C-alpha cells in the first residue's frame, strides 16, 4: 500500500531544496508526494518540475511590512488556516512534514488540529518563531544543527539535506593534494547577491600583488551582474563573473576557498563538500541566526567567521594573502568531519517510521 506525505516548504531555496531532496528519497521508496506551497512561490515551479502533486495557499512573510498588513494579519491567517485544512482533508496524508517557509506554519497548525502525524525540520541553529510554536505540537522535531531545539523526547539531529552530487565529492585531502599556483576563490552571494561582498571583494583583490592574486569566480545575483562588472573594472581585477551557478558541486570541488554568507543550507553544503570558507553572516538576519550557523564551522577551525562590520578591503586582502594551502586543506578536512551526509535519509526514514507508530 502506497503512503502519502504532504511536504510544506516555500519562500527560499534554503527551505525548498532540502524538501525536494527528501521528496525524491521518499518517491524512490514508493511514496506519493504532495507539496504545499504558496501561490507564485519558487516552490511551485520546482515541485512541478520534479513531478510532484502541488497544492497552494495564499500567505506570505510579514517582517518589515506596513501597518495595514499587520492589521490584516488575523484575517490572512484565518484564510491560510482554512485553505491548509481543506488541503489536508483532500490529500489525507499519512505524514505531514514542515520544512519551513510561509506555508509551514498554517499547514503545521492544521495538521496538528486534524490529528495528522506532524514532523518539522529546523534548518537553522536558532529556530524562528513559527518552529518554536510548532515544536510544541509536532510529533518529531528534526534538526539541521545540534541543540537548535532542546527536547529529549522529540528532537532528532539529522543535519540539513543537501544535493547528492555534493556529498559524493572526493575527500578534501585528495582534492587539495598536489594543487599549486594561485588559489581558486569562489565568492557566492546567493540568488539575490550580497552587496557587501560585491563591493568589498574586488577592492580587496586590487590590494593583492597580481602574482599572488587568487583566481576568482564571483556569483553576483540575478540583478547585480552589471554593477559587479563595474566594480571589478574599476579595481582593475579580472574574474569570472556570473549571475548564477548551475553546478555548485563542481564549483565547490575545484575551489580552494569560498567567501559567502552563512545561511543554514550554505553552511551544510560547505561541510558536505569539505571546502575552506570565510563566512560573512548577513547582519540583519532574524535573531542573527547566520552568525550562530557560522560558528558551527568556525568553532571547530573549519571556517573563518568575519562579521560584516569588520569586512574591509584592507583586512580581507591581508587575510587572503596570509592563508597557506596547508591551512586551507586543514580547514576543508575539518569541515568534512562536521558533515551529515545521511541527512536526507535521516529525515525521510524518520517520516517513514511515523507510519508504523
From Swiss-Prot:
Pfam families, alphabetized: Glyco_tran_28_C, Glyco_transf_28
GO MF annotation terms: UDP-N-acetyl-D-glucosamine:N-acetylmuramoyl-L-alanyl-D-glutamyl-meso-2,6-diaminopimelyl-D-alanyl-D-alanine-diphosphoundecaprenol 4-beta-N-acetylglucosaminlytransferase activity; undecaprenyldiphospho-muramoylpentapeptide beta-N-acetylglucosaminyltransferase activity
Membrane association type: Peripheral membrane protein
Main location: membrane
Binding site residues for UDP-N-acetyl-alpha-D-glucosamine: 12-14, 124, 163, 191, 245, 264-269, 290
EC assignment: 2.4.1.227
Pathway as given in its UniProt record: Cell wall biogenesis; peptidoglycan biosynthesis
Example of a GO cellular component annotation carried by this entry: plasma membrane
Gene3D superfamilies: Glycogen Phosphorylase B
Family: Belongs to the glycosyltransferase 28 family. MurG subfamily.
Name of the protein this chain belongs to: UDP-N-acetylglucosamine--N-acetylmuramyl-(pentapeptide) pyrophosphoryl-undecaprenol N-acetylglucosamine transferase
The species this protein was found in: Nitrosospira multiformis (strain ATCC 25196 / NCIMB 11849 / C 71)
Amino acid at each position: 500500500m502506497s503512503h502519502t506525505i504532504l511536504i510544506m516548504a516555500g519562500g527560499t531555496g534554503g527551505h525548498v531544496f532540502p524538501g525536494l531532496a527528501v521528496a525524491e528519497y521518499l518517491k524512490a521508496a514508493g511514496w506519493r508526494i504532495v507539496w504545499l506551497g504558496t501561490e507564485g512561490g519558487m516552490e511551485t515551479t520546482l515541485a512541478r518540475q520534479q513531478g510532484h502533486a502541488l497544492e497552494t495557499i495564499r500567505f506570505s512573510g510579514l517582517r518589515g511590512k506596513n501597518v495595514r498588513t499587520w492589521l490584516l494579519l488575523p484575517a490572512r491567517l484565518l484564510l491560510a488556516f482554512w485553505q491548509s485544512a481543506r488541503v489536508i482533508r483532500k490529500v489525507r496524508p499519512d505524514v505531514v512534514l514542515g520544512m519551513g517557509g510561509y506555508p509551514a506554519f498554517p499547514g503545521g497548525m492544521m495538521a496538528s488540529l486534524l490529528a495528522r502525524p506532524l514532523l518539522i525540520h529546523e534548518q537553522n541553529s536558532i529556530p524562528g518563531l513559527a518552529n518554536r510554536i510548532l515544536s510544541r505540537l509536532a510529533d518529531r522535531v528534526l534538526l539541521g544543527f545540534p541543540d537548535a531545539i532542546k527536547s529529549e523526547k522529540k528532537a532528532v539531529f539529522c543535519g540539513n539535506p543537501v544535493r547528492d552530487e555534493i556529498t559524493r565529492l572526493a575527500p578534501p585531502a585528495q582534492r587539495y593534494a598536489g594543487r599549486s599556483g594561485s588559489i581558486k576563490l569562489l565568492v557566492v552571494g546567493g540568488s539575490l547577491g550580497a552587496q557587501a561582498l560585491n563591493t568589498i571583494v574586488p577592492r580587496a583583490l586590487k590590494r593583492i600583488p597580481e602574482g599572488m592574486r587568487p583566481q576568482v569566480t564571483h556569483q553576483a545575483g540575478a540583478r547585480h551582474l552589471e554593477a559587479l562588472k563595474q566594480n571589478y573594472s574599476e579595481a582593475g581585477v579580472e574574474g569570472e563573473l556570473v549571475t548564477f551557478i548551475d553546478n555548485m558541486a563542481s564549483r565547490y570541488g575545484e575551489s580552494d576557498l569560498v567567501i559567502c554568507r552563512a545561511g543554514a543550507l550554505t553552511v551544510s553544503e560547505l561541510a558536505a563538500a569539505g571546502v575552506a570558507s570565510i563566512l560573512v553572516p548577513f547582519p540583519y538576519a532574524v535573531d542573527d541566526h547566520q552568525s550562530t550557523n557560522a560558528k558551527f564551522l568556525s568553532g571547530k577551525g573549519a571556517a573563518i567567521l568575519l562579521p560584516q562590520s569588520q569586512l574591509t578591503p584592507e583586512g580581507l586582502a591581508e587575510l587572503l594573502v596570509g592563508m597557506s594551502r596547508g591551512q586551507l586543506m586543514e580547514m576543508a578536512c575539518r569541515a568534512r568531519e562536521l558533515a551529515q551526509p545521511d541527512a536526507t535519509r535521516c529525515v525521510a526514514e524518520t517520516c517513514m517510521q511515523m507510519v508504523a507508530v
